[in-house]
Structures are given as structure tokens and as C-alpha cells.
């Protein structure tokens, strides 16, 4: 007899939870993710009731070929049902979001009626003993509003994704479209258009560098003193006929052509005299709040150089628990959240740590602490922001005890969390003004008065040597400095940058598109489909991606756009809050969407017949050549229109031949000639092997240790 059965979705959590729940009272089992899916037939829902149609679990006996070590869904469900029948209490403890709520509902729905009465739903935002024990003390019923919101999202994605994917596959040989992925693709295409139509503005500046010494007094220890031109002598400007701009929003003088800048620079001679020193101005820099999913993705991608997928994977490991000094420990709170809230208890623990390690003067002013505020955007399921589970476990404690990736991401999260509750940094900025032949210049000196939260970033912050510090105690009005260098420099405005994975996620979040659980796929799915490539971390849309976006925009512009997707996310939130009936919502959308699809099918079918001809014939069968796309969709090539009867093809970047040259030397095993070949996976590496491969697998001894056929 099992006293308490705890059902979770991830097998990786089992080991962590077992430390907190005594084995004689609790048994923990995992669903290994979603326990059942909608059927694929008819998009997986009933068109009369708009309810999901679930697959028959008794027939799902096939194992995932990539995870053969795991049980099939049939075996998992059968095991859970058997254990549930033998249990006194059943705690459904899947993740604290809508996906997790749906997983718990599926387990509940599959149980025998007598076992359903034993079920209670529990959630915890972090896997610590206190959080788990507290959750067991506060069980609740499954929130059917959350479940229905997840149903609606799943059906909506099927409605849009399946129908559009079929159209694209038949017309463009493109693999898929989707409610959110296609909006992300549209962002990429719109940015390409902005770049294409961008016209740069050119201007020139006259930049002066002064020697850092004045009468053998070094006033600037780390570098020369750079001056910014602020005002030109009117008489000089008139005599030289200078073309320049000194707009209010420009800090210096912009010359409109190089000739004017050069004429002015040639007039600058002699010494530069200090004529005024402004009163210092005090500036305060506040720390950022704790991480959300989107801000963690952005920072980890930018600072660690990771992909969005990697950030998600490592964060999940830290949440579920890893081995720390031989003990399984969950290190961070739930990593899928759009909240910046933290509990009062955790805040108190952090403040005690800060006071102990740095002193009470490093604590943030209570009146200035940024509290969690709800704006128009709904914070999904009232999670906390991402933070360490134990603030006393510092990054240094983990440095040599966990994987490098786990350490780096934990360090980002730990520093951001502690810094969010520390005092502002305080900086003084003083403007020093110089004059030369009635032309006025200035420079600014910065000095850090109190480091505050920035103290935590000393080890990982960028180099700040470029910041200018002038020892004002050694400087007075009337001091004169000689120039070290005067230069004329060209500048131009740059086009908007292409998106990186980080900036795309940031843009999608700003537009209220997607949810924390989907940010990873939103950034990566267009790469996987061949609609875009990453070059030096920037997205470049492919020709196929352009065609897909153009067709979707042409026929489904009312669906594949930012405002519609934002509206859909809001509707899903309203379903979760019991403000909207999910079946009525789906019915209204499906009725309108089907008519759009019908119109698009007629239009696309007409275009489909018009193949893109190359205007020459196949050299093998004399049929016309046409343009095609590779299976992945990211490479265009020339192929025969009579495919598959004729398989002739031409690639603009053909794969290098593996065989480089035939040698005079014979194979000692089969007497065929030896050849020099490239390795299959690295074209730069070569080896010598038998030309009779694969019948003969001889490799010359010098290479045998490195290459195996």
C-alpha cells in the first residue's frame, strides 16, 4: 500500500524530491513530459464542440526512437494507474504553469473513477524542502480555467499551423508555418526591408586630444584628454565659409562636409585654456530587477554567447537539480516566468546576506525598491522572478563542483538577484570647458563616489578604462594644455541592426507576443525550417523565408501579424481567468479562418502550376530545368522538371568531393589502388585509404589511429 503518490512531469526532478520526502511515506513517479497528445486526424478536435480529441493511450506502445531507454506512454500510464490504485493520496505536482496544469489534468482524466477522488493539485515555484512541504500543506483542485486555456492554445496552434503548413508544403516545399513562428519570421523580413531602404547620413567632426600634463602636473593619469567642439568662433566661421550643424540634440559640432572640417582644423594652433569648470552633477544608477525568462535569455545570449536553446536547457537543469558536492540540489526557481516579483521571505534572506557581507549601507533604500507592478500585460500565473533557491550558495561555492555552463548561468542569476536589492551606485560628473581662438570645447570627468550594486559586477563587468577621470584638485581656471593630436573623422548613421536571438526575443516580448515557455522555439524554429540562417549571431532571412513570409502576408496578413498575435495571447489569458469561453473563442476564429484558407488555396494553386524555369534543358534527358529547394529548404538548386524519373541537379556551392587523387601505390590487402580522401565531416582533414571502400576498409597506418572507415 502506497501512502502518498506524487506525480511530476520530469524524471530529473525525482532524485531531488526524494531528498525531501521520506521513502516510507511517499513514492514519486514521472510522466516524462506530456502524457498524451491530440490525434492528428481532423486537426485533433471536434468541429461541432471544439473540444480536443485525445489519442487512445492503450495503442501508444511505440517508444521514442531517440529515447529508447525510456518507457512508452502506454507503459508510463499503465504504471501510474496501477500505483494510483494502490495509493491513499495522489498529489499531482507538475510545473506551476498552464502546461503543467494540463499535464496534471491528463493524469487525473486517465485514472479510474475511484482514484480521482484521491487527487489533489500541488505546485511549488522552487524545489526546496520548505517549498515542497508548504505545497503539501496547501493542496487544491485542478484549475480547469488554466486547463481550458491550454486546450485553446493547442487547438489554435493546430488550426493555424496545420492548415498553413499544408499550403506552404505543397506550394513552396516549405516545412511549416505557425501562429508565433511566422510572426517572428515577419519581424526578420521587415527588418531586412528597413535595412534595404536605409539611406545613411554622413558628417564629420574635428576631434582634439590634449596632453594629460600641465606644468609637469599629471591631471589625467590613464589617458590623454579628449575634447568635444561645442561652439565655433562666428568670425572664423564666416571667413572660412564653414558648413556645420549644432542642433540642440547634438552634443558637439557636426560638419556637413570634410572640406569644412579640414579648413577649421587647420586653424587650431597653440594652447587650450581652461575657462570654466562646471559644478559637479551627481548621478544615480539603479540595479535591474531579478530576471524574467526573456531578460535571462537576452543576457545569457549576449554575455555568454549561447543559443536560446542552450540557455533554456541549462536553466532547466539548475531548476530540476544537479549534483553539488555529492548532494542533489535545485539551485534556481522556476525558469519560465514573466514576473519580477520575489517573496518577502526571500527578500529578507537576501537583505541579511547583503548586510553581513557588505554592510547595511549597501542595502537598497526601502522607498526606492522596485516593487512588482502589474501593467496591461498579464503576468502569467503569478510566478516569482528567476532567483537562486539558496542565496547563501554563492557562485564561488560552485565554481569547481559543477559543469562550467551551469556555473556561468548560475553566476548571472545569483549576481542579478543580489544586486537587485542593493543600493544605487553614485557617480559624479564634472564638465571642464576649454577655449582656443574663441572656439569652445569641453570634456567631462567621471568619478565613482559609491559603487553600490556595481560592486558585485567587478569580476564580470566590461573594461571601464575608457572612462575619463581628471584629478580636479590639480586643475584650475587659466590652466593651459598643448594638443597632442587634432584629427578630422568621418561618421555615418548605421541601418537598424539585424536581429540576434536575444534582440528578437526582446522585441517579441515588448510586443506581448508569446509566453516564457515559447521564447526558445520562437527564436530557433525559423532556423530549423531553413527560413533564416545565423551568421555571426545575426539572423539573415533566406530566399525561402522571404517567399514564405510574402505568401503568408499576402493571404493571411490579418492573422500573421503582431496585433493579431497579441490579441490571441490576451484572449488565452482571459480564458485562464474565466472571462471568455474557450469553445466560443475557437468557433469564432475557425469560422473566419477557414474562409481565408479557401481563398488562399485557389490563389496558391494557380501559382503552383507556374514553375520557375531556368531557361535551359536538362543535359541528361532534355526536359526543362527548374529551380528547386533542398529537403531542409534552406538551399536553392537547379533540378530536372522530370524528377523523380531524372535526378539531375546543379548546386551553386557543391559539396567537395571526398576523393582528391588516386595514388600509384597499391593496397596491401586487396591490390586495388590507394586514394587520398577527405574525411566525411571535416573537409580540411585528409587520409589515405583503399579505393575499393567499402569492400576494403584498409587505411594507411600513419592515419589509422586518427581515422576509421
Curated annotation (Swiss-Prot):
Q: Where is the active site?
A: 334 (o-(5'-phospho-dna)-tyrosine intermediate)
Which coenzyme or cofactor does it need?
Mg(2+)
- The organism's place on the tree of life at top rank: Bacteria
Keyword DNA-binding carried by entry: yes
Instruction: Mention one GO biological process in which this protein takes part, according to its record.
Output: DNA topological change
Where is the site Interaction with DNA?
34, 153, 157, 336, 529
This protein's record includes keyword Transmembrane helix: no
- Entry's family note: Belongs to the type IA topoisomerase family.
Q: Output this protein's name.
A: DNA topoisomerase 1
Amino acid at each position: 500500500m502506497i501512502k502518498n503518490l506524487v506525480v511530476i512531469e520530469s524524471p530529473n526532478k525525482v532524485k531531488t524530491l526524494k531528498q525531501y520526502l521520506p521513502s516510507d511515506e511517499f513514492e514519486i513517479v514521472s510522466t516524462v513530459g506530456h502524457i498524451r497528445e491530440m490525434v492528428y486526424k481532423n486537426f485533433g478536435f471536434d468541429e461541432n464542440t471544439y473540444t480536443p480529441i485525445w489519442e487512445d493511450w492503450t495503442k501508444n506502445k511505440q517508444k521514442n526512437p531517440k529515447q529508447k531507454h525510456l518507457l512508452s506512454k502506454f507503459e508510463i500510464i499503465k504504471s501510474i494507474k496501477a500505483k494510483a490504485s494502490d495509493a491513499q493520496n495522489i498529489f499531482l505536482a507538475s510545473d506551476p504553469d498552464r502546461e503543467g496544469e494540463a499535464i496534471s489534468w491528463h493524469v487525473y482524466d486517465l485514472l479510474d473513477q475511484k482514484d480521482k477522488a484521491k487527487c489533489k493539485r500541488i505546485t511549488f515555484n522552487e524545489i526546496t524542502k520548505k517549498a515542497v512541504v508548504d505545497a503539501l500543506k496547501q493542496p487544491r483542485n485542478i484549475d480547469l480555467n488554466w486547463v481550458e486555456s491550454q486546450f485553446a492554445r493547442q487547438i489554435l496552434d493546430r488550426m493555424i499551423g496545420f492548415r498553413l503548413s499544408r499550403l506552404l508544403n505543397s506550394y513552396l516545399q516549405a516545412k511549416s508555418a505557425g501562429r508565433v513562428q511566422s510572426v517572428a519570421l515577419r519581424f526578420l523580413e521587415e527588418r531586412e526591408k528597413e535595412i534595404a531602404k536605409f539611406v545613411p547620413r554622413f558628417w564629420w567632426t574635428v576631434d582634439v586630444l590634449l596632453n594629460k600634463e600641465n606644468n609637469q602636473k599629471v591631471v589625467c593619469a590613464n589617458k590623454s584628454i579628449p575634447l568635444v567642439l561645442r561652439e565655433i568662433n562666428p568670425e572664423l566661421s564666416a571667413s572660412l565659409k564653414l558648413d556645420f550643424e549644432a542642433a540642440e540634440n547634438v552634443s558637439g559640432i557636426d560638419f556637413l562636409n570634410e572640406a569644412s572640417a579640414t579648413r577649421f582644423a587647420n586653424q587650431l594652433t597653440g594652447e587650450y585654456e581652461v575657462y570654466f569648470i562646471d559644478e559637479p552633477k551627481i548621478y544615480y544608477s539603479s540595479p535591474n530587477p531579478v530576471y524574467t525568462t526573456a531578460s535571462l535569455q537576452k543576457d545569457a545570449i549576449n554575455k555568454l554567447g549561447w543559443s536560446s536553446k542552450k540557455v533554456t536547457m541549462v536553466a532547466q537543469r539548475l531548476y530540476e537539480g544537479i549534483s553539488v558536492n555529492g548532494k542533489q540540489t535545485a539551485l534556481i526557481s522556476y525558469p519560465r516566468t514573466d514576473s519580477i516579483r520575489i517573496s518577502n521571505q526571500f527578500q529578507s534572506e537576501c537583505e541579511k546576506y547583503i548586510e553581513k557581507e557588505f554592510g547595511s549601507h549597501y542595502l537598497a533604500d526601502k522607498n526606492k525598491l522596485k516593487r512588482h507592478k502589474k501593467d496591461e500585460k498579464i503576468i502569467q500565473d503569478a510566478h516569482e522572478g528567476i532567483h537562486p533557491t539558496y542565496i547563501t550558495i554563492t557562485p564561488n561555492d560552485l565554481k569547481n563542483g559543477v559543469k562550467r555552463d551551469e556555473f556561468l548561468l548560475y553566476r548571472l542569476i545569483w549576481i542579478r538577484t543580489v544586486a537587485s536589492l542593493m543600493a544605487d551606485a553614485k557617480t559624479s560628473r564634472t564638465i571642464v570647458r576649454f577655449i582656443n581662438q574663441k572656439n569652445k570645447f569641453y570634456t567631462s570627468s567621471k568619478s565613482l563616489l559609491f559603487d553600490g550594486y556595481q560592486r558585485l559586477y567587478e569580476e564580470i563587468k566590461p573594461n571601464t578604462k575608457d572612462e575619463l577621470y581628471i584629478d580636479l584638485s590639480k586643475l584650475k581656471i587659466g590652466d593651459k594644455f598643448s594638443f597632442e593630436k587634432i584629427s578630422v573623422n568621418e561618421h555615418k548613421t548605421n541601418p537598424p541592426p539585424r536581429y540576434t536571438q536575444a534582440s528578437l526575443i526582446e522585441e517579441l516580448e515588448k510586443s506581448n507576443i508569446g509566453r516564457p515557455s515559447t521564447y526558445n522555439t520562437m527564436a530557433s524554429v525559423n532556423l530549423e525550417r531553413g527560413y533564416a540562417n545565423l551568421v555571426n549571431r545575426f539572423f539573415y532571412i533566406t530566399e525561402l523565408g522571404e517567399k514564405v513570409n510574402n505568401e503568408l502576408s499576402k493571404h493571411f496578413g490579418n492573422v500573421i501579424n503582431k496585433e493579431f498575435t497579441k490579441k490571441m495571447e490576451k484572449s488565452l489569458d482571459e480564458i485562464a481567468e474565466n472571462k471568455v469561453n474557450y469553445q466560443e473563442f475557437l468557433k469564432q476564429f475557425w469560422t473566419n479562418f477557414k474562409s481565408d484558407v479557401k481563398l488562399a488555396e485557389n490563389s496558391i494553386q494557380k501559382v503552383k502550376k507556374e514553375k520557375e524555369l531556368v531557361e535551359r534543358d536538362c543535359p541528361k534527358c532534355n526536359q526543362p530545368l527548374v529551380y528547386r529547394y533542398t529537403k531542409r529548404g534552406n538551399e536553392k538548386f537547379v533540378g530536372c522538371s522530370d524528377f523523380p524519373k531524372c535526378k539531375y541537379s546543379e548546386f551553386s556551392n557543391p559539396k567537395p568531393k571526398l576523393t582528391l587523387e588516386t595514388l600509384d601505390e597499391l593496397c596491401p590487402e586487396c591490390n586495388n589502388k590507394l586514394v587520398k580522401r577527405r574525411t566525411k565531416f571535416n573537409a580540411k582533414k585528409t587520409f589515405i585509404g583503399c579505393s575499393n571502400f567499402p569492400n576494403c576498409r584498409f587505411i594507411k597506418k600513419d592515419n589509422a589511429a586518427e581515422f576509421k572507415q
